[in-house]
């Protein structure tokens, strides 16, 4: 709201006094004390004036630079770009701040009288948005992607495969007999085990894949740029790592195993592939791994490893 009111006020004032008589406005304290940053630029990009809030953001805003083209002072500003809303990062030292800008065109007698940059520090707002976005896409218990989050990433990979030919693979993982952990030791133990599993998966993936909690004790792993054989190797490392893992819990030492189903995009040329199709294939491979004795890896269309 502040942006629109300020833009309206400034636009009316500048239209009233004309661009050449704008100093009549600047003599008033209100221009200087407004909390939003204000920077006035001529129609050909010459710095005319600014207020205190603008000067605290950009060190190059001082008297000796008035009359100079702003793109010489800071290449991020261009009145010819036609921008109306944009963000930039700035700050002093390691401190980085994010500013939201609005570029308002001011009317002169016969042509554009100039431009008014209005900007506001939105660092906290953007941090909150990022935090909310992270919370929406990540499981609150384990920190892995949520089901919706990991499927959104899968859609991106599938799009890259269809448009650019970038292969990827998908692993569906189920914790064997996980219910026994909850039944015998309680849900706190079960939650602890899930967190340890995610940590172990992440160490094996080492940034080369994405992990999501698909539901309960089921996980979905995406491995970009990996064909079936490489993905099966990753899956076996995941399985072996979990088999060797122990989790202290009170006076007890807990352990589990996992079953894994693996599928790769493009494994069956000529067939229409969607995320639902790939997940279904991985799930069928997982089902076969569980029916073959659990604690093993099955590749879709092949025998258990």
Residue positions per predicted region:
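Active-site-proximal alpha-helical element of nucleotidyl cyclase-like catalytic domains
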Residues: 189-210, 218, 237, 242
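Catalytic-core segments of nucleotide cyclases and related cyclic-nucleotide turnover enzymes
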Residues: 129-130, 228-232, 250, 265-305
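Interfacial "cap-and-anchor" motif at the non-cytosolic start of specific transmembrane alpha-helices
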Residues: 1-34
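PAS-family sensory domains
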Residues: 111-121
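Conserved nucleotide-binding and Mg2+-coordinating catalytic segments in signaling enzymes
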Residues: 133-152, 173-187, 195
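Active-site-proximal structural segments of metal-dependent nucleotidyl cyclase/transferase enzymes
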Residues: 151-185, 201, 212
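Amphipathic HAMP/coiled-coil signal-transducing linker helices
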Residues: 28-30, 126-145, 159
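A short pre-motif secondary-structure segment
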Residues: 210-213, 254
């Amino acid at each position: 709201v502040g942006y629109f009111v300020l833009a309206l006020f400034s636009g009316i004032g500048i239209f009233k006094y004309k661009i050449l008589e704008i100093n009549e406005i600047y003599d008033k304290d209100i221009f200087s004390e407004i909390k939003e940053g204000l920077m006035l630029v001529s129609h050909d990009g010459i710095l005319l004036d600014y207020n205190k809030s603008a000067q605290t953001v950009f060190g190059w805003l001082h008297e000796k630079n008035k009359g100079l083209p702003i793109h010489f002072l800071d290449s991020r500003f261009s009145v010819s770009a036609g921008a109306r809303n944009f963000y930039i990062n700035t700050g002093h030292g390691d401190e980085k701040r994010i500013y939201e800008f609005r570029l308002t065109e001011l009317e002169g007698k016969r042509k554009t009288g100039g431009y008014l940059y209005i900007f506001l520090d939105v660092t906290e707002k953007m941090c909150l948005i990022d935090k909310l976005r992270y919370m929406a896409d990540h499981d609150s218990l384990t920190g892995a992607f949520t089901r919706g989050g990991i499927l959104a990433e899968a859609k991106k990979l599938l799009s890259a495969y269809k448009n650019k030919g970038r292969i990827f693979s998908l692993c569906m993982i189920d914790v064997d007999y996980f219910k026994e952990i909850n039944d015998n030791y309680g849900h706190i133990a079960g939650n602890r085990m899930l967190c340890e599993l995610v940590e172990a998966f992440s160490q094996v993936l080492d940034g080369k894949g994405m992990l999501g909690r698909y539901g309960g004790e089921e996980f979905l792993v995406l491995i970009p740029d990996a064909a079936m054989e490489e993905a099966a190797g990753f899956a076996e490392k995941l399985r072996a790592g979990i088999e060797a893992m122990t989790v202290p819990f009170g006076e007890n030492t807990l352990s589990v195993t996992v079953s894994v189903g693996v599928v790769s995009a493009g494994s069956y040329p000529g067939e229409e592939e969607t995320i639902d199709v790939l997940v279904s294939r991985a799930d069928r491979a997982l089902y076969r791994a569980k029916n073959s004795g659990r604690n093993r890896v099955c590749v879709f269309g092949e025998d258990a490893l």
